Amino acid sequence: MKNKFIILIVLFFQLSQTYAQQTQKGLLWEISGNGLSQPSYVFGTIHLICPDKFFVPKGTEEKLKAAQQVFLEIDMDDPQMMMKTQKLMMSSDGKKLKDIMNESDYQAFSEYFKKNVGMDVTMFGPAKPFLYMSLAMMKSTGCPMPKSYEEYFVKEAKTENKEILGLETIEDQMAVMDKATTEQQVSWLMEIVNETEKSNETYKQMIDLYTKQDIEALTKMISEQMVGMKGMEEEMLDKRNQNWIPVIEQNIKQKSTFFAVGAGHLGGEKGVLKLLQQKGYILKSLE
């Protein structure tokens, strides 16, 4: 069984022309050329990482300070974010977890959730499965208080009085998750219970690739793990990458911009770096 649960963690919670023919490495990239009057930058994040693995590549803070604005996948500085998220996490049909799972699966997941998260699943009423995944994912990181690159960049941007914007909205992100069938979402919940050790190992492997700044290998691993997800790779990665390009182009033509998005979106033939290359921009790794 592929570790779909871990892929959801990596993707949501939250190349120069010469270099494209080589192994792509580096989390920080410079965007230039194609008539731009000033460079912009794109940084590949991982949404949750243990403090002892957290690092900021040399030059990242300097480039963020040089930029005039900061873009994340979504605007994490939106004062309405928490309220919007809570609303979107609730099932529109009012169904609770026990209504969409068979009795044995519900019992197994309830016990796992209580033991590992320390909460009763009944606390959340008609919450979507993704809420339970979001809370359970803390366990897979292997540390009690994982750090977030998104929170780091929000803090740095505020310190530098930079405007913080989003490439998409929280509504856009949840709409992607809502395209998964109920059966798919239940299977992801049960993977948390039945594939705990394998999921933890997969996550460790991804963190290792991330700290090595090997975005191509990371993208390949994510793609392999998504086999069998019935079109969700296209929804979670490819379409979102395509949707971001016009927003990126519009902004880099006007201001030097620092973008921070999941590292899994950067590599590959359909990744953000390749798509920008195809538009005529020069992508240079600042590793």
Question: Where do the PLM segments sit?
Answer:
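A cross-kingdom marker for long, charged
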Residues: 231-287
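Short, glycine/serine-rich, charged loops/turns that create anion-binding
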Residues: 12-13, 47, 264-265
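Bacterial Sec-dependent N-terminal signal peptides
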Residues: 1-24, 29
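A conditional alpha-helix N-cap/helix-loop micro-motif detector
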Residues: 21, 53, 146, 237-241
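Structured, acidic catalytic/metal-binding patches in enzyme active sites
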Residues: 28-41, 46-232
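Short, glycine/charged-enriched secondary-structure capping and boundary segments
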Residues: 20, 56-57, 85-86, 272-276
